[in-house]
Amino acid sequence: MSKESVAIIGATGNIRNYPKSEGRLVDLGRGLVTHSFLVIPECPDPLLGRDLLQKLRATISFTGEGPPEIRTEGKLLVTAPLEEEYRLFLEAPIQNVTLLEQWKREIPKVWAEINPPGLASTQAPIHVQLLSTALPVRVRQYPITLEAKRSLRETIRKFRAAGILRPVHSPWNTPLLPVRKSGTSEYRMVQDLREVNKRVETIHPTVPNPYTLLSLLPPDRIWYSVLDLKDAFFCIPLAPESQLIFAFEWADAEEGESGQLTWTRLPQGFKNSPTLFDEALNRDLQGFRLDHPSVSLLQYVDDLLIAADTQAACLSATRDLLMTLAELGYRVSGKKAQLCQEEVTYLGFKIHKGSRSLSNSRTQAILQIPVPKTKRQVREFLGTIGYCRLWIPGFAELAQPLYAATRGGNDPLVWGEKEEEAFQSLKLALTQPPALALPSLDKPFQLFVEETSGAAKGVLTQALGPWKRPVAYLSKRLDPVAAGWPRCLRAIAAAALLTREASKLTFGQDIEITSSHNLESLLRSPPDKWLTNARITQYQVLLLDPPRVRFKQTAALNPATLLPETDDTLPIHHCLDTLDSLTSTRPDLTDQPLAQAEATLFTDGSSYIRDGKRYAGAAVVTLDSVIWAEPLPIGTSAQKAELIALTKALEWSKDKSVNIYTDSRYAFATLHVHGMIYRERGLLTAGGKAIKNAPEILALLTAVWLPKRVAVMHCKGHQKDDAPTSTGNRRADEVAREVAIRPLSTQATISDAPDMPDTETPQYSNVEEALGHRLRGTKDPAGWWHLPDGRLLLPRAVGRKVLEQTHRATHLGESKLTELVRKHYLICGIYRAARDITTRCVACAQVNPGAAPVEKGLNSRIRGAAPGEHWEVDFTEMITAKGGYKYLLVLVDTFSGWVEAYPAKRETSQVVIKHLIHDIIPRFGLPVQIGSDNGPAFVAKVTQQLCEALNVSWKLHCAYRPQSSGQVERMNRTLKETIAKLRIETGGDWVSLLPQALLRARCTPGREGLSPFEILYGLKPPVVPRVGCDKLASITNQTLLKSLQALQATRSLARATLRDQLPQKEAQQDRTPLFQPGDLVFVKKHDFQQLGPRWDGPYTVVLSTPTAVKVAGKTPWIHYSRLKKAPDNQEEWTVSPTSDPLRVKLTRRAKP
């Protein structure tokens, strides 16, 4: 009965209230309805009320004779618009509530709301496989609020009553972590099994991919039912020996219980639970799939979806599935069941009449995500919205700024306009997502591909009449190598990427790829200058698969829809012609000799080592003359020299028609093949790194345009025949090798005196004239002073011009410039003029590392007034040692110079704080001030907050000025140098050698003659060898001498007394070892089995001492007490001949 009642006035005129029944299913003959009946026990016969007659659409008529007649059939005239006429033939959908109530009566055992948790009747208990190195882990229970504990108490009592939990005593323990259910005061019981998961073997996950699962749903099946299994994991039993590892603490004061509980079923939070349950349920439902081939059943762990063609088929299949689940022991949530509907929500997607779209709840959840503050929040946002990427055209291009913002390790998040625009654009795209069609595997697919800014974009469609219906929007970022290709080749990479993605939805069905590029021609005639053989093969295997894959070229794709433009007048470009124009550095460049060349040049670069130095030179020659030849800086590679020589040849050939020969494959390929590729990539290699010799390559690509016509040919080097090509190449090689050892041309530019004005006489001052006479110089007829050492005395004005010209050619510093010019000229005031010229040079000011001089007294560092008052701290990078240690945290007390250093795996603020709190402050007291550079570990918020809490001043030094931290920087160098020396002597790693390096640094005297050890402890450093008794006579201080002698006598007496009290040991120097190398011995086993041997072996003795031996096959030394001699002749060797007279066969056999 329901709580509702109705007031009734009967024939007597009295008013009485009668109750109404709950809604019951009533079959009216034309369909099912829900009706609440009025319950009147006094009524002798059932009566049809007006409400039920209205649902029957009954007509009551009265005739003259007989009782009234009730007719429920008749003709009804319906007038409707033609476009709405189809509605007359639709079946009225059955309400979800109606079916749920009916099936709760028919199949009561399957519903979770009215039954205890289920148990799969056909599944064997699960055995959990631990790692071979796993040991029990014990993690104490987190504090739980009283409200959460009350909520968990009811859940645990229910599970204990159902046998899902049981008391246990286990060495394992992990905590519970209650999680509040959204919108309620209840808590979900979650166990923190992270430590257990680390110690359990991971099985291969076989859970279906939700990205492709709905692709298995035929679009013509438009009636759906969705079932969600309740407490699904608890249906699978757990083996008793595996139950102990999932124990947790629980105390129930009301029941008077306290101890550990564990699961007897598969627990939630265990990393293998989804896979184990998915496989178990899939096996149990195999029979249902075979019995119902006309419906589709999709399973994602515990979420089930049935799809059928008609409502009747969906009803029948859903009923059978519920009965099957009830028989197997599973439970279905009635609250979440969606029964026989045309629109359902499954895995966050809304499915309706063969299409899928994003559910409103998922969209609203993403739209409410605030602007990220950390890189982790950016990754969380990308992961959440990435689940919806099929509905966002060009997702990869839109999200690229956000992906870029997550790089950089632990660096702070940089959030600018680009990141904000990308964040809002992705959210905006979610507010208007399209409805995507479910893929039909009976129809071919069309893939429209476009590439922009290194991102592949496309849309996968299927034909629906004359329209193209989208199935998915696809997008991926190209790898760095493909992103540097020309646009036509990037289209191939985009097509390959998206075809691979589309195959997850097409399942190998026919696909037509449409692009604005002629992809098929490019694939059949691949440009091997750009693509490696491996990539060509990969693309051809994936895309050249007729008739499954077909290509179609269109003029352009609409950037908004990624579908072809309808305008057929747009031109279609030719990809091969475009690639040829991009590959060639200039259109008329050829590798065949020109017939009417004005000159034929031969280039070569030479690089070789002599006296430990690498000399290099380059030359450009003809058959009878040298065009250009110069030495190159020490250390120049041969490839770089070849590029320079070829560039000089092209520069000399300006406005000429020339043939140029080179024997360098590198220079030839750079000019003909790779030069434009490097330029397109932004001077990057295939791996995304900067190319070598980038300035020389750019100069070569610029110089190739200077000749009027040019042909560059490759010839073999070091040929001995008399062909003109070989002769010219040999000549270029000889000249290049010859000039390599010459001084650089910088000195040649000033080796001769500059051109002096012929019409002007040098104007010497009186001082300069007197200087010329004093140095016994002579004047030539032109008036120039020549000194006896061969130098020329220059007036100040002329001398300044010489200095300026020399500096422009060399950009030498003040001292080197003066030294160089003084070899040829004598100039009064040369040092002042050189200083003025070098100071005024803009190029030198921009490049030279020297900074402006600091006024004396301003660059002094702060030092403490007592030990431990002021510390300088810094991280220095080391080579990676055992344990992953890569950094060294160094702290120096500025007062005493005492150093502390700690190895670290990461350069983080946690490391700094740990050693400050645990090491520095407990040992040296609270510092007044700490100084450091602006490293992330020191400017971190947590570091600064700690200093504020401790009232310690943290001084950040000037950026890019290591002198501000000079004391700790110098200590870094000292420690590294000491460790390097110790590594050379011992071969150990730097972590193990660090204590010895610290000892050396702490005991080294400073400028005042005192070491940090002396300043801190007031004692001499314990590193100087002790002075023995034989040295005491050399000491002149008689008082000190007597004291030392008395101390030595007391020491000797004490040692003698103690020596007499010790037990006498047998002399072992003459004792012969019991076992000799080569002997066979048995080794006693530590743990032998009953009825098994106690001794292992025999083993051969390798080394022996009077007390222990080392045997072959065992690492440790073994004491004599665990050895015994093995009998001799334990094995026998025999020699037998073979078919080869030079070989014999040796056979070893153990004697019985």
Curated annotation (Swiss-Prot):
Instruction: Name the coenzymes or cofactors required.
Output: Mg(2+); Mn(2+)
| Segments forming domain Peptidase A2 | 1-52
Metal-binding in keyword set: yes
Query: What residues does the Integrase catalytic domain cover?
Result: 863-1020
Give GO terms for biological process.
DNA integration; DNA recombination; establishment of integrated proviral latency; proteolysis; symbiont entry into host cell; viral genome integration into host DNA
Q: Which reaction does it catalyse?
A: DNA(n) + a 2'-deoxyribonucleoside 5'-triphosphate = DNA(n+1) + diphosphate; Endonucleolytic cleavage to 5'-phosphomonoester
Q: Which residues bind Mg(2+) 2?
A: 604, 642, 663, 733
- Residues engaged in binding Mg(2+) 3: 874, 933
- The site feature described as Cleavage is recorded at 78-79, 751-752
Keywords on this record?
DNA integration, DNA recombination, DNA-binding, DNA-directed DNA polymerase, Endonuclease, Hydrolase, Magnesium, Metal-binding, Multifunctional enzyme, Nuclease, Nucleotidyltransferase, RNA-binding, RNA-directed DNA polymerase, Transferase, Viral genome integration, Virus entry into host cell
Q: Where are the annotated segments for Disordered? A: 1128-1152
| InterPro entries per the UniProt record, alphabetical | DNA/RNA_pol_sf, Integrase_cat-core, MLVIN_C, Peptidase_A2_cat, Peptidase_aspartic_dom_sf, Retropepsins, Rev_trsase/Diguanyl_cyclase, RNaseH-like_sf
Q: Where is the Reverse transcriptase domain?
A: 158-351
Family statement: Belongs to the retroviral Pol polyprotein family.
What more the UniProt record tells us is: Strain A is a helper virus of the strain T.
Protein known as: Gag-Pol polyprotein
State the species of origin: Avian reticuloendotheliosis virus
Q: What is the lineage of its organism?
A: Viruses, Riboviria, Pararnavirae, Artverviricota, Revtraviricetes
* Protein's gene: pol
